[in-house]
From Swiss-Prot:
InterPro entries xref list: Alkaline_phosphatase_core_sf, ApgAM_prokaryotes, Metalloenzyme, Pglycerate_mutase_ApgM
Identification of the protein by name: Probable 2,3-bisphosphoglycerate-independent phosphoglycerate mutase
Keyword Isomerase in record: yes
Primary role: Catalyzes the interconversion of 2-phosphoglycerate and 3-phosphoglycerate.
Length: 402
């Protein structure tokens, strides 16, 4: 099998160009009852002006018809084949909040949830504040310290999210998610996918029962869903593969974790879109690749909140001149997957892609939205091809062959 990363890496000729990868999480959508997507509805003069000078297309994050998680969606954009590198969400969330993960550790991402009896009625427990969630994490740490010979530690994340770390011998990560993924479904326990993970299955399921008992008097955060069980994987570093000095500008822990996993330097980004863009401006001379992550487009898509998704897109557009004034050699605007508001979740639909550079076939597109991207000059490509294109537009790839 051809090692795409190796082929690209051997063609790279470093220069002084700057590349910005702006990921609007879950940006792709499908029309609502008015026949519009949030990108079509949004007032985006800056993105639309950029489209006239850019090459547009759409990406397939994994394979046609496959609905990707955020991990595979991002790995593809970073130039890693998501079918080769299968990463659990737990390690991403853990690294994102600076949890040390050793060789005897198994980690999982947790969602606080609300149950009525054994039925999940709210998978996010009403989206509590991070402060409220941290108090419940403290209760769990006080009451659940060990199961058999395995140490249990809980770590607070943002809002309803947390991380649980299992430390002990013989813990493997081939486990089903302990999350039914939908409300109105009964509690779901994990199952081992092979014999090596039977111990992990037993420990996790005992933990779920203990969490239920400890939190039974909590008004909303009275249960937890666990998913993305994972050990620490071994991966080539982004900077070594692509000969770039990368910085990650992200607010949410999981995306910081993704960046750390591939060796990007995670920088302090503030909390708002304006903060993130100003962080890029502040550090412009220190790095030559910037990954910038915008979360709320995905959050509002999952909530089915069309108008709020539109507002986030408009906010990105409002502050886009901060990035444009830096005059990047390559600016990529895309998403890691589609999150249609009408579906309230990730979907298999292709993802809008726009690449601005000085050497594009400008003039073919007039707007930035799903339909302009579908007929754009780049066509439909795999997300894993975005990084080679970025390097090519930046003048960093030599000719292949004689």
């Amino acid at each position: 099998m051809i090692d795409r990363q190796k082929v690209i890496s051997e063609l790279i000729s470093p220069n002084t160009s700057k590349i910005v990868l702006l990921v609007m999480d879950g940006i792709g959508d499908i029309p609502n009852e008015e026949g519009l997507t949030p990108l079509q509805k949004a007032n985006t003069p800056n993105l639309d002006a950029l489209a006239k000078k850019s090459d547009l297309g759409q990406t397939i994050p994994v394979l046609p018809g496959i609905t990707p998680g955020s991990g595979p969606g991002h790995l593809g954009l970073f130039g890693y084949d998501p079918l080769k590198y299968q990463i659990g969400r737990g390690i991403l969330e853990a690294l994102g909040i600076n949890v040390e993960v050793g060789e005897n550790d198994l980690v999982a991402r947790g969602n606080f949830a609300t149950i009525d009896g054994d039925i999940i009625v709210d998978r996010r427990a009403g989206r509590p504040s991070s402060e409220e969630s941290a108090k419940v994490v403290e209760i769990l740490n006080e009451n659940i310290k060990e199961i058999e010979d395995v140490k249990i530690t809980f770590y607070p994340g943002k809002e309803h999210r947390f991380v649980v770390k299992f430390t002990g011998e013989g813990l493997m990560d081939k486990l089903e998610d302990a999350d039914p993924q939908k409300e109105g479904k009964p509690i779901k326990y994990t199952k081992a996918l092979d014999e090596s993970s039977k111990k992990s299955e037993r420990i996790v399921n005992i933990l779920l029962d203990k969490i239920k008992e400890v939190l039974k008097d909590q008004p909303k955060m009275n249960f937890a869903l666990l998913r993305g069980f994972s050990k620490h994987p071994d991966m080539p570093k982004f900077g070594d593969v692509f000969k770039l000095k990368p910085a990650a500008v992200a607010v949410y822990p999981m995306y910081k974790g993704l960046a750390k996993l591939v060796g990007m330097e995670v920088v302090e980004a503030g909390q708002t879109i304006e903060d993130e863009f100003n962080t890029v401006k502040k550090l412009w001379n220190e790095y030559d690749f910037f990954y910038v992550h915008i979360k709320k487009t995905d959050s509002y898509g999952e909530d089915g909140n069309f108008d709020s998704k539109v507002k986030v897109i408009e906010e990105v557009d409002k502050f886009l001149p901060i990035l444009l004034e830096l005059n990047p050699d390559v600016l990529i605007v895309t998403g890691d997957h589609s999150t249609p508001c009408v579906m309230k979740g990730h979907s298999f639909h292709p993802v809008p892609l726009m690449i601005y550079a000085k050497n594009t076939r400008r003039g073919l597109s007039k707007l930035f939205n799903e339909f302009e991207c579908a007929r754009g000059s780049l066509g439909t490509i795999h997300a894993v091809d975005v990084m080679p294109l970025a390097l090519a537009y930046a003048g960093r790839l030599e000719k292949y062959g004689a």
